Amino acid sequence: MNPFQKNESKETLFSPVSTEEMLPGPPSPPKKSTPKLFGSSYPLSIAFIVVNEFCERFSYYGMKAVLTLYFLYFLHWNEDTSTSVYHAFSSLCYFTPILGAAIADSWLGKFKTIIYLSLVYVLGHVFKSLGAIPILGGKMLHTILSLVGLSLIALGTGGIKPCVAAFGGDQFEEEHAEARTRYFSVFYLSINAGSLISTFITPMLRGDVKCFGEDCYALAFGIPGLLMVLALVVFAMGSKMYRKPPPEGNIVAQVTKCIWFAICNRFRNRSEDIPKRQHWLDWAAEKYPKHLIMDVKALTRILFLYIPLPMFWALLDQQGSRWTLQANKMDGDLGFFVLQPDQMQVLNPFLVLVFIPLFDLVIYRLISKCGVNFSSLRKMAVGMILACLAFAVAALVEIKINGMIHPQPASQEIFLQVLNLADGEIEVTVQGNRNNPLLVESISSFQNTTHYSKLRLETKSQDLHFHLKYNNLSVHNEYSVEEKNCYQLVVHENGESLSSMLVKDTGIKPANGMTAIRFINTLHKDMNISLDANAPLSVGKDYGVSEYRTVQRGKYPAVHCETEDNVFSLNLGQLDFGTTYLFVITNITNRGLQAWKAEDIPANKLSIAWQLPQYVLVTAAEVMFSVTGLEFSYSQAPSSMKSVLQAAWLLTVAVGNIIVLIVAQFSGLVQWAEFVLFSCLLLVVCLIFSVMGYYYVPLKSEGIHEATEKQIPHIQGNMINLETKNTRL
């Protein structure tokens, strides 16, 4: 996550509401001297702002890290709906900064805007946490509380986004420009620290702590909510130390009105008798000053280059949705640590901290020494290509995962597994209505196999005839089956005879890295088995079959079991990621219950570490595209237009999330094909952007009405420097 994108307040390092960038307004009151931090040139008030930002980023990213799995496993939405709502929320977080900037510029000022919208932010966390308490109402109430909470959070985080960093910049005197430069570096580090820590911790709160016998989403949302309360309290504590510039007018609104007036005026004066004007924006000259029109002209040249950018964000922001769902189907055991699927996102902020200085101090300098003109637009194009490669790698990983997933029966098909609990080998023959053998198989006693036989039906539902041979016994049974289901035929001795029962199997690999288990009780007593904080699992006597129960991956050496007159312990051993187990309780010994363990569906075998290459590629793409993009944009835009440019940049991110939302709902593609689609779309967009960049003529500083010398952002490692220099590409 870099200082400009992927985080909602990272983009505010050059704020749309900076007082330095506004058109001339009413004179500001003289700035008062503020106490310094430990005798330095830093205002003491900066400490409150930096701590506030750390807590707010912890709050936002901590909540967002577990959001997709909350939709999937708490609200029980499907993957497409979960992805769509996730990106709709992300998109809303990028639309609301325009509202926050307008409120701060035109009405309340930055300080009051941060305070009031932080209260809205906290209220959103309250609703979100209440919507994650299982005993509070039903699914409808949980959904309503969650959506209301997310809407308030989007308004809060987006609204304060364009204000916090700029408000910190307002605290410095003009003669302390170097200290202000270091402030932006510290501010950026606080953002990534909050993101890094929260993305690692909140999945642990969700998965390792149990609430009401389930994953503790209420705690995973509640702790970020408390951090937002802390952020608000800390920020308010510094109130008397802050410099609070008054609102000076909304430049975004002025630019919008100027463009709209020019368009309307042009259409009102379409007569051939009226002389044409050199540029379509010149039609605003009747109402707006020349310097504003010149600035808007410079702005539109850059906005034209922004047209292809949303597709890049469409790929980048899927780390928290589609890539988390992919990690959900992989083996998180790294040997020294078990990684939760939603913890993989922690790689992004960690790699950003490594890559920004690496690229700036090593890679870019080496390329420069080779005599290659690696311009800003070329860096952005290479960033797009790296994102394409990241999704191509993600597609390959998805294909590999699909090859390991247990297949599902198609139309007019069933899968059948025979489980032999007798003392010797049995022969099974399955026949259809036409007495044609669908299956002939010999099964050893207690044979552990994950093999399912595929049987073709004549209709959607059908009666099948089972012929069992055991020693000198021959038994015939008839069972009804339905298409697209998996079944287990359980065969066992019954005195001197042979009995069987057909049990419907789940046939589906447990999601979220969970383990699914069920029991067959061969004893003559009913049994209750306590696996977790939920109600005990009941298993009837004499080959009773329990329901499936999903539990966390791990070791279960002493599971509590009860009959009506005794208590036992049962060692289940290691239960692995994504596995379905059957335990057949066979007898009682001095050491407790004895059970035979069968693996019906094998574990997730592909390590989650295989996602590392795609995360490395997409983070490198983010550093090259996002950091460079704003550096280029700000070097090419007049200072009065930087706020509008910031709003436009955020809008490209919002549109990118909308693209993902649309594709998730309407593409109908399998996941690996969707990854390939996004990769190909971005490749096409990259070619278009490259052509646009080839014909782009850098704007000379002399071509702007402003002075030749101006402040433009310069990125140096993870430092954000405001240097005075000529505007050159």
UniProtKB/Swiss-Prot annotation:
Optimum pH is 6.0 or lower. Disruption phenotype: Decreased dipeptide uptake in bone marrow. Decreased cytokine expression in response to LPS stimulation. It catalyses: N-acetyl-D-muramoyl-L-alanyl-D-isoglutamine(out) + 3 H(+)(out) = N-acetyl-D-muramoyl-L-alanyl-D-isoglutamine(in) + 3 H(+)(in); a dipeptide(out) + 2 H(+)(out) = a dipeptide(in) + 2 H(+)(in); glycyl-L-leucine(out) + 2 H(+)(out) = glycyl-L-leucine(in) + 2 H(+)(in); glycyl-L-lysine(out) + 2 H(+)(out) = glycyl-L-lysine(in) + 2 H(+)(in). Residues 1-34 are annotated as: Disordered. It is found in: Apical cell membrane; Cytoplasmic vesicle, Phagosome membrane; Cell membrane. GO terms for molecular function: dipeptide transmembrane transporter activity; high-affinity oligopeptide transmembrane transporter activity; peptide:proton symporter activity; tripeptide transmembrane transporter activity. The modification Phosphothreonine is found at residue 12. Residues 1-57, 109-113, 161-183, 239-295, 365-380, 633-643, 696-729 are cytoplasmic. The modification Phosphoserine is found at residues 9, 28. Expressed in kidney brush border cells (at protein level). Highly expressed in macrophages. Belongs to the major facilitator superfamily. Proton-dependent oligopeptide transporter (POT/PTR) (TC 2.A.17) family. Proton-coupled amino-acid transporter that transports oligopeptides of 2 to 4 amino acids with a preference for dipeptides. Transports neutral and anionic dipeptides with a proton to peptide stoichiometry of 2:1 or 3:1. In kidney, involved in the absorption of circulating di- and tripeptides from the glomerular filtrate. Can also transport beta-lactam antibiotics, such as the aminocephalosporin cefadroxil, and other antiviral and anticancer drugs. Transports the dipeptide-like aminopeptidase inhibitor bestatin. Also able to transport carnosine. Interacts (via extracellular domain region) with trypsin. The extracellular domain (ECD) region specifically binds trypsin. This is Solute carrier family 15 member 2. The gene is Slc15a2.
